[in-house]
UniProtKB/Swiss-Prot annotation:
The keyword NADP does not apply. It is found in: Cytoplasm. ATP binds at G115, S116, N117, G118, K119, S120, T121. Pathway: Cell wall biogenesis; peptidoglycan biosynthesis. Gene3D superfamilies: Mur ligase, C-terminal domain, Mur-like, catalytic domain, NAD(P)-binding Rossmann-like Domain. This is UDP-N-acetylmuramoylalanine--D-glutamate ligase.
Length: 447
């Protein structure tokens, strides 16, 4: 099925932002269709926004609906291995995701980004580059706007962040360029191993005109790809780095573009992210001067190594977006603090192995605070960890003990779903409490 013709009965699995975008997409199409929604949650988010013409089955599956459907549209959080979906597929029912619907109707150029870490930063950065060049750009997918909602007002360019979950149900997305940033262990509760997880991400290259991979992470190399390939990395090939007169530059084929010291984003990992964004920007002919201006101005997204309070010589940093081990390792890399690091970790560990943190923490003056459902998994990593139920409790203890020169860093290495709706809510809670706790910080009490 290459378009929307012939689809009369649609069943949407999972409500929330994505599910609602799918429902609204179908309601905008011409022709009569029977649209139903199944959500196994008793009170699905977004239920109050569901049009009365759309029937909802909440709190359970409805196999009759599934088996009578012409098309099932599954939200990314619903695994294709779910028995009910396996049964529907075996009965010959096509199962797609919202990105596949987007792919079947979009008419403007699209670039896409996947990877274990850095997706949101690179996606947003390319969006800023396009805006700086005066391009009417839509930025979304796994970040910000649902992809289908961006079609309400047509754009001249679309930039999509795509998760492995979204790519599993996408088969015909035509891309001007796609980048696979990096691979690290994540979502091991959903995949049979790292190779299985990577194969899902590799689907981003299937219909791309240009594949961009990370030379410093060869797991991202598009092995079975017959179109144009380029790469980014920290050596001087393709999109890389060169040094001239003691200054390091972003470069293409050893030709300097701009100083890395002029990039507004902080951290070595963001130099790599800038190179990846540069490659995709070139693929859709975004003006190079606009690209450089965006790199000089864009200082990142909320919840990603975000300095939220710096008072009494104690820094509070919100890295709630660090929902896996690799993100936390990136945050810790290169830290050089005059005082102690108070590191808050824990939440929903998603079946990950956190032992790699042990060597990194051994080189830091660190007090570890372990909270949430899987916080106890971090306890063997350091001597004298503090294990406590909630992030708020950990923050209160850190505030009472922090001294001048210390940093209190939320970089949990875990998802938030055990105690928060999402990482943004966790980060917002951290920011709110960090501000409220200022009177308890040692520097404040000494005044």
């Amino acid at each position: 099925m290459n378009g929307l013709g012939g689809v009369k009965k649609v069943v949407v699995i999972g409500l929330g932002m994505t599910g609602l975008s799918v429902v609204n997409f179908w309601l905008r199409q011409t022709g009569d269709r029977d649209i139903k929604v199944i959500d196994t949650r008793a009170t699905p988010p977004g239920q109050d926004k569901l049009p009365s013409s759309v029937e909802l089955c909440a709190g359970q599956w409805n196999m009759n609906w599934l088996l009578e459907a012409d098309l099932i549209v599954a939200s990314p959080g619903i695994a294709l291995a779910t028995p009910e979906l396996v049964a529907a597929k075996a009965a010959g029912i096509e199962i797609v995701g919202d990105i596949e619907l987007f792919a079947r109707v979009v008419t403007k150029p699209v670039v896409a980004i996947t990877g274990s870490n850095g997706k949101s930063t690179v996606t947003s950065l390319i969006g800023e580059m396009a805006k700086e060049a005066g391009i009417n750009v839509g930025v979304g997918g796994n970040i910000g706007f649902a992809a289908l909602d961006m079609l309400v007002n047509e754009h001249d360019l679309y930039v999509l962040e795509l998760s492995s979950f979204q790519l599993e149900t996408t088969s015909s997305l035509q891309l001007k360029a796609a980048v696979y940033l990096n691979l690290s262990e994540d979502h091991m509760d959903r995949y049979n191993g790292l190779e299985d997880y990577s194969l899902a991400k590799m689907r981003i290259f299937e219909h791309a005109e240009l594949a961009v991979y990370n030379r410093d992470d060869l797991a991202t190399f598009p092995v079975s790809f017959s179109h144009q390939i380029t790469s980014f990395g920290f050596d001087n090939q393709d999109y890389g780095l060169v040094t001239l007169h003691g200054e390091e530059f972003l470069a293409l084929d050893e030709q300097p573009i701009m100083k890395t010291s002029d990039i507004a984003l902080v951290g070595r990992h963001n130099v790599a992210n800038s190179l990846a964004a540069l490659a995709l920007a070139d693929a859709v002919n975004i003006d190079r001067q606009a690209v450089c201006r965006a790199l000089q101005r864009y200082n990142g997204l909320a919840h990603r190594c975000q300095l939220v309070v710096n008072q009494h010589d104690v820094k509070w940093v919100n890295d709630s977006k660090a929902t896996n081990l690799a993100s936390t390792l990136a945050a810790l890399k290169g830290l050089n603090l005059p005082g102690k690091l108070h590191l808050l970790v824990g939440g929903d560990g998603k079946g990950a192995d956190f032992s790699e943190l042990k060597l990194v923490l051994a080189d830091l003056n660190v007090q570890l605070y372990c909270f949430g459902r899987d916080g106890n998994q971090f306890m063997p990593l350091v001597d004298a960890p503090i294990c406590i139920e909630t992030m708020a409790q950990a923050m209160a203890i850190a505030a009472d003990t922090a001294q001048k020169g210390d940093m209190i860093l939320l970089s949990p290495a875990c998802a938030s779903f055990d105690q928060f709706p999402n990482f943004m809510a966790r980060g917002d809670a951290f920011i709110e409490q960090a501000k409220a706790l200022q009177p308890r910080v040692a520097g404040a009490k000494a005044c």
